[in-house]
């Protein structure tokens, strides 16, 4: 990365109008550069003499002219975010003052920071591991408190510690195996099959637990695309409005009111749903409404893209051919059947047994009266796995980490199978080495430059 050993600066707060704008400066000449453009209010104060973890009030100067009141926060190396000398300068929010401050710093010798360059320096200077660096953007992008807690657990180093325990156990096993094979004259105790396979099985189970929790963790952090499907006038838009908490979609007794997809993000329990209310799905003949037909095609297309399906049925009417077609299309997907209009249901109730083969969950509701909302909330959390997930526990937080953990798990499975099928310890040792290499890739201990660049290409400037 360019400027890795220069002094850099960037806006650390969102651009535009706001209460304050904060510019971060990091590098070996941070104090010298800021000293050129910062004038303390109190006589006798200077940037050069400022101690770490202190603040100073002053004004910043642009081409010698006093521009705006400014608060400087000082961090001395190595006790800073990047491990370098860091100064954070806060001025009044707004583009003009922030841009003026950046211009002053760059004129005085700072280089503009690239995306993620502050965190990259923290990694280079040993302030955080690669998994912690990845967690930085996860914390920023997290949706909901539990998603943020999950990302923060990785930022706090819990994932690195959990992977470290697995690595230590496997390295100890590998060292024993290597000593026994390579130095027979040293009278190293023989490694029994039970002990060898037992350790591999235990650590494989630990990786299985991490891998199995990835999808639910991703849902907590980023939310899930959820499509509302059903034939016309079953109450999809009423359900959307209930979940949104306001009248987002038009609701009328006229079937087919919704023609195009209506989008709305909502928080349902601990899960953020990116809802898509679709046109009612039904068979439209060749001479039918072309606009409605296009809306239905889009509805079916959305089904293929969704991470969660809420299939809505009118509980007061028998299942129609269109209902059964919807049920068949939902089979094998993360789908919940919502039996709406329970207040009108009587002898014509939809038989649950007819729908059970197609849906993992069935929830009776009356969306108009908000009846069954908690049951739907619980069903969504249970189906997506977030109900069982501990947000304080260490979890994988990127596709890269998942791929590395999967490689390690698969290598351990091969090592176990090798011994169980009568292959020698040398064959199992190769698989064990592969597993350790995958774990080193995960934590970043042996990460290539390409891997590190891949991690930081998603970062924003200022972080």
Question: What do these predicted regions represent?
Answer:
Residues 292-316:
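Inter-motif core of Ras-like GTPase G domains
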């Amino acid at each position: 990365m360019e400027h890795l050993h220069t002094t850099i600066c960037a806006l650390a707060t969102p651009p535009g109008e706001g209460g304050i704008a904060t510019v971060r400066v990091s590098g070996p000449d941070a104090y010298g550069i800021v000293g050129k453009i910062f004038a303390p209010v109190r006589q006798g104060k200077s940037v050069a003499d400022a101690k770490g973890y202190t603040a100073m009030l002053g004004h910043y100067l642009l081409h010698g002219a006093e521009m705006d009141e400014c608060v400087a926060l000082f961090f001395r190396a190595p006790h800073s975010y990047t491990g370098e000398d860091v100064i954070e300068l806060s001025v009044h929010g707004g583009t003009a003052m922030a841009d003026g401050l950046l211009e002053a710093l760059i004129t005085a010798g700072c280089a503009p920071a690239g995306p993620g360059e502050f965190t990259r320096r923290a990694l280079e200077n040993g302030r955080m591991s690669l998994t912690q660096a990845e967690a930085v953007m996860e914390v920023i992008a997290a949706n909901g408190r539990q998603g943020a807690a999950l990302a923060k657990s990785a930022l706090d180093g819990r994932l690195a510690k959990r992977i470290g325990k697995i690595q230590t156990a496997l390295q100890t096993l590998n060292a024993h195996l290597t000593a026994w094979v390579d130095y027979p004259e040293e009278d190293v105790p023989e490694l029994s099959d039970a002990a060898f396979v037992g350790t591999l099985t235990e650590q494989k189970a630990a990786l299985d637990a991490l891998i199995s929790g990835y999808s639910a963790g991703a849902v907590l952090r980023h939310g899930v695309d959820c499509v509302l499907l059903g034939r016309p006038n079953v109450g999809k838009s009423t359900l959307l409005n209930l979940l949104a908490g306001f009248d987002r979609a038009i609701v009328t007794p006229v079937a087919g009111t919704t023609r195009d997809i209506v989008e709305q993000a909502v928080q349902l329990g601990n899960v953020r749903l990116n809802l898509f209310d679709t046109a009612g799905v039904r068979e439209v003949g060749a001479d039918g409404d072309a606009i409605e037909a296009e809306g239905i095609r889009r509805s079916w297309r959305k089904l293929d893209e969704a991470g969660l399906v809420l299939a809505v049925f009118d509980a007061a009417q028998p299942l129609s051919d269109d209902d059964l077609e919807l049920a068949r299309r939902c089979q094998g997907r993360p789908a919940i059947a919502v039996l709406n209009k329970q207040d009108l249901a009587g002898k014509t109730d939809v038989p649950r047994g007819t729908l059970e083969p197609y849906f993992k969950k069935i929830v009776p509701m009356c969306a108009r009266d908000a009846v069954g909302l908690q049951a739907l909330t619980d069903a969504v959390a249970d189906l997506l796995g977030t109900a069982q997930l501990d947000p304080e526990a260490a979890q994988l937080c990127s596709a890269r980490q998942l791929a590395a953990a999967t490689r390690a798990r698969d290598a351990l499975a091969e090592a176990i199978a090798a011994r169980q099928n009568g292959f020698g310890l040398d064959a199992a040792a190769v698989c064990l080495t592969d597993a350790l290499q995958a774990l080193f890739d995960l934590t970043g201990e042996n990460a290539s430059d390409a891997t590190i660049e891949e991690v930081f290409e998603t970062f924003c400037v200022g972080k």
